[in-house]
Amino acid sequence: MKHSLMLTVVLLLTPLAALQAAGLKRPNVVLIVCDDLNDYVAHLGGHPQARTPHMDALAHGGVSFRRSYCQDPICAPSRASFLTGIYPFRSGDFTFRPWFEFPVLQNSRTLMEHFRANGYYVVGSGKLMHHHRQSDWDEYPYKADYGPFAYDGKERVGHPSVPEPYRSIGPVDGSFGPLSDVPFGGRGGKGWIYGAWGKVKPMRYVNDDDRDPTPDERNARWAADRIGQFAREKDARPFFLAVGFIRPHTPMYAPKKYFDLFPLKSLQLPVIKPGDAADTHYRDVFSDEIKGLRYYRTLGQSYPTVEEGLKAFLQAY
């Protein structure tokens, strides 16, 4: 079975109340969120070798905001901020604590609630808020699933093809590679599994054209099918549909053909300036064992050279 990803976005820039007051038809709105996506998108120029034709086509048909930065460098508070319109310094939400535990956010309207209050039917799937709240949605078929994961017959593990000590970081952040590299050869109850915590659901893989869909592919298919269903329905209400993709967040697994697009020898690494962080307050706030620094150091220790480790990781990204 061939897998494809259909991305559709409509950006609503006019306040809904103003549209209603003017007697104009309210548009249907699709919101797409990608986790950990940086500016390595061709039209943004973040990396000279980036190949993102569908994102480029989407950008060329609309407006691209090149200086729109995240409100917080981790996903939970950043998502809570842009889906409520409240800065972290106003809400106090800076870490991974559930956003709805903060009084300011408890008493604020989310984007989803705002659409519903203006007569929209609100549906979503995948990873949108880091901490999901079902009451925000009329439909939400699939919660965030970071899978597939490598499974050793007992538990989720780092992918066996990733060298140590990086693999020991674990099944999420310590793993990347092509889907064709089935963990443990797929024998004896081992192989790929989906990522719902507390459950073990195998993901069937024969080859890249004969396999179960990844969670992101499943969400893309749901979004495309649901949009088609809306088009056939008689419901007079406009819809707000949001779909959240996990990738390129770790674990970075993808069909092999995408790895083949970027041979390791040809990859260009970004410039890394010696002592570039020395004039910042990074180490005044964080220790050398903070996740990012530790992961970077461990990646370099896992390959013959730091450059080889960075290229392997960059290829997967």
Language-model features: locations:
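Bacterial N-terminal signal peptides
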Residues: 6-17
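Formylglycine-dependent sulfatase
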Residues: 2, 19-317
